[in-house]
UniProtKB/Swiss-Prot annotation:
Region Disordered, annotated ranges: 49-78
An example Gene Ontology molecular-function term: structural constituent of ribosome
High-level lineage: Bacteria, Bacillati, Bacillota, Bacilli, Lactobacillales
Gene Ontology biological process terms in this record: translation
Keyword Ribosomal protein: yes
Species the sequence originates in: Streptococcus gordonii (strain Challis / ATCC 35105 / BCRC 15272 / CH1 / DL1 / V288)
Originating gene: rplD
Domain of life: Bacteria
SUPFAM superfamilies linked to this entry: Ribosomal protein L4 (SSF52166)
Stored NCBIfam families: rplD_bact
Name by which UniProt lists this protein: Large ribosomal subunit protein uL4
Family: Belongs to the universal ribosomal protein uL4 family.
């Protein structure tokens, strides 16, 4: 079992937390992490690209000249693809780029990135993050006390609304819960700040 130091909100050591090696101590599988990141980035694409085909372009209902007798090539519409201003053939249409990977693959990727953060000492555990009201300045003090001045992903337990509201306006700070933290979020952060309750939830979900 891997042990990490446990801090309180003031930055003082409050003991140690024992992490489950099956989740936080595995050999990272880079191939699986890569596949999941590509999947999650694809899901973020809007996919709203669109062009007009010949039926969508305005005009072109009248045959430009008669079929025979002019010496010119036969034409049925000035909105055919070969005309300037005509419709596009086989152009992009709005679509979703999202696709799902197997649940086991997604879980292995999460375990891999969590394990990597723990191995690199970029996993900061706190006993709790409790606030009586949403206060951005108070959360900034917590980060300063914990010597966190880089891009950080804060992982909270469900229902800790005041902490989430306190952190969301800070630059380089992203907030997630134990069930919503994604592989992409974790990889994009320099450090993880995780509450003790969130650690328990992560171990419950990924067990």
């Amino acid at each position: 079992m891997a042990n990490v130091k446990l801090f309180d909100q003031t930055g003082k050591e409050a003991g140690e937390v024992v992490l489950n090696d099956a989740i936080f101590g595995i050999e990272p599988n880079e191939s699986v992490v890569f596949d999941v990141i590509i999947s999650q980035r694809a899901s973020l694409r809007q996919g709203t690209h669109a062009v007009k085909n010949r039926s969508a372009v305005s005009g072109g209902g009248r045959k430009p000249w008669r079929q025979k007798g002019t010496g010119r090539a036969r034409q049925g519409s000035i909105r055919s693809p070969q005309w300037r201003g005509g419709g596009v053939v086989f152009g992009p249409t709005p679509r979703s780029y999202a696709y799902k990977l197997p649940r086991k693959v997604r879980r292995l990727a999460l375990k891999s990135v969590y394990s990597e953060k723990v191995a690199e000492n970029k996993f900061v555990a706190v006993d709790s993050l409790s606030f009586t009201a949403p206060k951005t300045a108070e959360f900034a003090k917590v980060l300063a006390a914990l010597s966190i001045d880089t891009k950080v992903l804060v992982i909270l337990e469900e229902g800790n609304e005041f902490a989430a509201l306190s952190a969301r306006n800070l630059p380089n700070v992203k907030v997630a819960t134990a069930t919503t933290a994604s592989v992409l979020d974790i990889v994009n952060s320099d450090k993880l700040l995780v509450t003790q309750a969130a650690i328990s939830k992560i171990e419950e979900v990924l067990a």
